[in-house]
Amino acid sequence: MTADSVLSIPPYKADDQDVVAELNSRFGAETFTVQSTCTDMPVLWVAREKLIEVLRFLRNLPRPYVMLYDLHGVDERLRTQRRGLPEADFSVFYHLLSIERNSDVMIKVALKEGDLKLPSATGIWPNANWYEREIWDMYGIHIEGHPHLTRILMPPTWEGHPLRKDYPARATEFDPYSLSAAKQDLEQEALRFKPEEWGMKRGGEHEDFMFLNLGPNHPSAHGAFRIILQLDGEEIVDCVPEIGYHHRGAEKMAERQSWHSFIPYTDRIDYLGGVMNNLPYVLAVEKLAGIKVPQRVDVIRVMMAEFFRILNHLLYLGTYIQDVGAMTPVFFTFTDRQRAYKVVEAITGFRLHPAWYRIGGVAHDLPRGWDALVKEFVEWMPKRLDEYEKAALQNSILRGRTMDVARYDTRQALEWGVTGAGLRATGLDFDLRKARPYSGYENFEFEVPLAHNGDAYDRCMVKLGEMRQSLRIIEQCRRNMPEGPYKADHPLTTPPPKERTLQHIETLITHFLQVSWGPVMPANESFQMIEATKGINSYYLTSDGSTMSYRTRIRTPSYAHLQQIPSVIRGSMVADLIAYLGSIDFVMADVDR
């Protein structure tokens, strides 16, 4: 697929039934069990024996489901609200995305505890590799035909599978941890890289290869991230990215927090994204609850999300330029970020992790004088972007280090699940704010920055263009902020509006229950994806009619982007890898969750 062939993306087709008709025509309606959900996409269960055939059919349709967007599992054993669904102890879902249809479909497979096996989908989508490893790691589901089925988020010596319902969720449920010298040696040895296990040779016919650890503590790794490089001189023959050092069990935590109290945890996924992290989560919960927020809430949410897009991109710009050797710009970008944080702190009361969005609204209304602060920032920032473009991005050394480096095309990007600026730098105009508007983005005028070479330089230039468009959106929010409440008038709005809480005993009781036990969400499944700072971020929520989520799946863009590294960087130099890593825009909290 080329970018030119899909530049005209059709309107978003939520719950697209065309693909259901195509599947029924090819395999027969009796092959599938259709599940009704709030996910805005067809959800179909299929027998394991038919799985690969169905997936391959969807991948090869005339308008194909070209991207394996997500792949994960659910422990179904304690789920009570399963009427009409196939009997299952565990289930695995495949979330597929079609650019040419602008629609999604989800295929599910039911598994019994004594027969936890699935065929690998890596022969259809190469990015299935890491997702299948994570299914094995978290649930113990064996993937037959996988090229190297090992743990990915947990240490290689770990015992058990953490997302199983019978696996403890709290540290106090374990024995006190101790690390003896012998155990430390064992753990260190387990991390020793053995090339033969990955199909690598220690040498060629006339040379020996060197194996070099880049990370897990390296300034260019942007976090606790290890890449084992197979080198012939300074040329990268192959490499193995190793993640998991920053894993905190965010999806497991979601099963022990109420729908309301999990909001602060979302801030820590992409810790540079601030309230941008809250948005897909609260939108997904609001789908479960049936809440429609006031227009003022939509505009406030959009404005603050775009502030954090700028904050993220400024840090990205400074560290990216620093990675290729220019030290000065990072100090300027960090100083400029303080201007944006001044506005964020005045409005939300916090800086890095406001946790400010609420189910049904935002924490409080905009303070007096907010518009003057926003106006000052929006008028000041464009000149700074002009300076960065002229002084840094037009610099001949930076251009020489990054142009035609780590280049990939649209087809490769889609095969590996790349989204955001990394995808748009290949020329594909796919931005969810335009293609699948949410939170009222359809009411704003802005452009989607594109490039066409798909290299490290283009990815940076797309990010610069996105900051300019974010300023346009913020200014429209300032000029057109509607009047009205900052929370929805709905029983599941959490917490309920303060004015009513102070005046009505029934609302006070509701407030007490919602912030202590948590609101009770109807049993169903919901899904929301957004155009986040680093690509597409989404929450897939399963409610069993309780105060807590039965299953929270967090799909982050950085996870997919790091899996692509070996396919892009083979044959390049180590210095090119540094430029490539800087151009991706990732943080390991977003990868490891």
UniProtKB/Swiss-Prot annotation:
Task: Return the annotated region ranges for NADH dehydrogenase I subunit C.
Answer: 1-184
Specify the protein's topology with respect to the membrane: Peripheral membrane protein
Q: Which InterPro entries match?
A: NADH_DH_suC, NADH_DH_suCD, NADH_Q_OxRdtase_suD, NADH_quin_OxRdtase_su_C/D-like, NADH_UbQ_OxRdtase_30kDa_su, NADH_UbQ_OxRdtase_49kDa_CS, NDH1_su_D/H, NiFe-Hase_large
Classification via PROSITE patterns:
COMPLEX1_49K
Name the Enzyme Commission number(s) assigned to this protein.
7.1.1.-
The subcellular localization recorded is: Cell inner membrane
Q: How is the subunit organization of this protein annotated in UniProt?
A: NDH-1 is composed of 13 different subunits. Subunits NuoB, CD, E, F, and G constitute the peripheral sector of the complex.
Q: Where is the signal peptide?
A: none
According to its UniProt record, which reaction does this protein catalyse? a quinone + NADH + 5 H(+)(in) = a quinol + NAD(+) + 4 H(+)(out)
Q: Where is this region: NADH dehydrogenase I subunit D?
A: 208-593
What GO MF annotations does this protein's record show? NAD binding; NADH dehydrogenase (ubiquinone) activity; NADH:ubiquinone reductase (non-electrogenic) activity; quinone binding
For this UniProt record, give its keywords in alphabetical order, as a comma-separated list: Cell inner membrane, Cell membrane, Membrane, Multifunctional enzyme, NAD, Quinone, Translocase, Transport, Ubiquinone
Q: Which GO terms describe its cellular component?
A: NADH dehydrogenase complex; plasma membrane
Please indicate if the UniProt record lists Cell inner membrane as a keyword: yes
Member of which family?
In the N-terminal section; belongs to the complex I 30 kDa subunit family. In the C-terminal section; belongs to the complex I 49 kDa subunit family.
Asked if the Swiss-Prot or TrEMBL record annotates the protein with the keyword Zinc-finger, the reply is no
The role this protein plays is: NDH-1 shuttles electrons from NADH, via FMN and iron-sulfur (Fe-S) centers, to quinones in the respiratory chain. The immediate electron acceptor for the enzyme in this species is believed to be ubiquinone. Couples the redox reaction to proton translocation (for every two electrons transferred, four hydrogen ions are translocated across the cytoplasmic membrane), and thus conserves the redox energy in a proton gradient.
Q: Which gene encodes it?
A: nuoC
Question: This chain belongs to which protein, by name?
Answer: NADH-quinone oxidoreductase subunit C/D
